[in-house]
Design a protein with these regions (language model features):
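Short coil-to-helix segment of the ABC ATPase nucleotide-binding domain corresponding to the Q-loop/switch region
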Residues: 98-107
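ABC ATPase NBD Q-loop/coupling interface
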Residues: 63-83, 113-114
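Conserved ABC ATPase "signature" region
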Residues: 69-73, 109-129
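The feature captures the beta-strand-to-loop junction immediately N-terminal to the Walker
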Residues: 39-41
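Short beta-strand immediately N-terminal to the Walker A/P-loop
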Residues: 36-37, 87
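Helix-to-loop junction immediately C-terminal to a conserved catalytic motif
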Residues: 54
Length: 129
């Protein structure tokens, strides 16, 4: 299924673990299809920004939109599996209680793909490696 690319907008987003905040009223608009690099020293908010976009954290203020769809605002966020995005972690880890095939199938299961289709896709993917 072909997906339509949508803009990503962060409007006045703030996030803090403590003082000072990691992101303070941060605003960014990314046009569909653009490639963006996040550069900066350790602790400047790059990973926090990605966690907010992925739905692994929620902002203290502001809002995040994918196109017209609100995916996060102060204290609330659409769950990661409902955001239609993917993220590859720098230091990834497999779920230790799952087999490799179960780890590969996990995002498909979260998307509601049928068991037979998951098994077909997992088998196809693992045959490549």
């Amino acid at each position: 299924m072909m997906r339509t690319l949508t803009p990503i907008t962060l409007q006045e987003v703030s996030f803090a673990f403590a003082e000072p905040p990691i992101l303070d009223r941060f605003t960014l608009h990314i046009e569909p299809g653009r490639i963006v690099a996040l550069l900066g020293p350790s602790g400047c908010g790059k990973s926090t920004l990605l966690r907010l976009l992925a739905g692994l954290s929620v902002p203290a203020s502001g809002e995040i939109r994918f196109g017209d769809r609100l995916v996060a605002r102060a204290g609330w966020g659409l769950p990661p599996e409902q955001r239609d995005i993917g993220m590859v972690f720098q230091d990834y880890a497999l779920w230790p209680h799952m087999s490799v095939a179960q780890n590969v199938a996990f995002p498909l299961r979260m998307r509601g793909v049928s068991r037979s289709e998951r098994e077909r896709r997992v088998s196809e993917a693992l045959a490549r490696v």
